[in-house]
């Protein structure tokens, strides 16, 4: 099953376990957010929203908040000794799609546990 969602003015086709970068969404890293603007649900019986599907949502886990690549805007007026250079970086949220929910259901999957690196055992015998 797939869904077409809209967030930040853009549309994304998603399936469970997809990882995607979207415009900044409020939420702590590791929490589950619900994206409510579902434009289409696909599968055995596709549903099209007019403009959205009532009661449908997509649950996603926030993996990271970061900044996108630098975009430089440069304008030059020839022979006028005039130029302007500006740059900016977008705020980006990295999401992992956990579930596609229809008919107003609540997400059943909680955030995944964080991986803990195993610490090496102390080498007490080697020091003696």
UniProtKB/Swiss-Prot annotation:
Purpose of the protein: This protein binds to 23S rRNA in the presence of protein L20.
- Per the UniProt entry, what is one GO biological process? translation
Which keywords are on file for this protein?
Ribonucleoprotein, Ribosomal protein, RNA-binding, rRNA-binding
Against Pfam families, the record matches this protein to: Ribosomal_L21p (PF00829)
Q: Which GO terms describe its cellular component?
A: cytoplasm; ribonucleoprotein complex; ribosome
Low complexity composition-biased segments? 119-128
Identify the stretch annotated as signal peptide in this record. Answer: none
MF annotations from Gene Ontology:
rRNA binding; structural constituent of ribosome
Q: How does it assemble?
A: Part of the 50S ribosomal subunit. Contacts protein L20.
SUPFAM superfamilies reported for this sequence: L21p-like (SSF141091)
Task: Give the protein family.
Answer: Belongs to the bacterial ribosomal protein bL21 family.
Region feature (Disordered): 104-128
Question: Which PANTHER family does the entry link to?
Answer: 50S RIBOSOMAL PROTEIN L21 (PTHR21349), LARGE RIBOSOMAL SUBUNIT PROTEIN BL21M (PTHR21349:SF0)
Q: Show the coiled coil region(s).
A: none
Q: Which organism is it from?
A: Rhodopseudomonas palustris (strain BisB5)
Name this protein carries in UniProt: Large ribosomal subunit protein bL21
Q: Which NCBIfam families match?
A: L21
């Amino acid at each position: 099953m797939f869904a077409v969602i809209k967030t930040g003015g853009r549309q994304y086709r998603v399936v469970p376990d997809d990882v995607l970068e979207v415009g900044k969404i409020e939420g702590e890293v590791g929490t589950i957010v619900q994206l409510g603007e579902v434009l289409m649900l696909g599968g055995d019986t596709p549903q099209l929203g007019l403009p959205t599907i009532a009661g449908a949502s997509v649950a996603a886990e926030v993996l990271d908040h970061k900044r996108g690549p630098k975009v430089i805007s440069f304008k030059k007026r020839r022979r006028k000794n005039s130029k302007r250079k500006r740059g900016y970086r977008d705020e980006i949220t990295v999401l992992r799609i956990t579930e596609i929910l229809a008919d107003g259901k609540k997400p059943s999957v909680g955030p995944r546990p964080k991986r803990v690196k195993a610490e090496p055992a102390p080498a007490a015998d080697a020091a003696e």
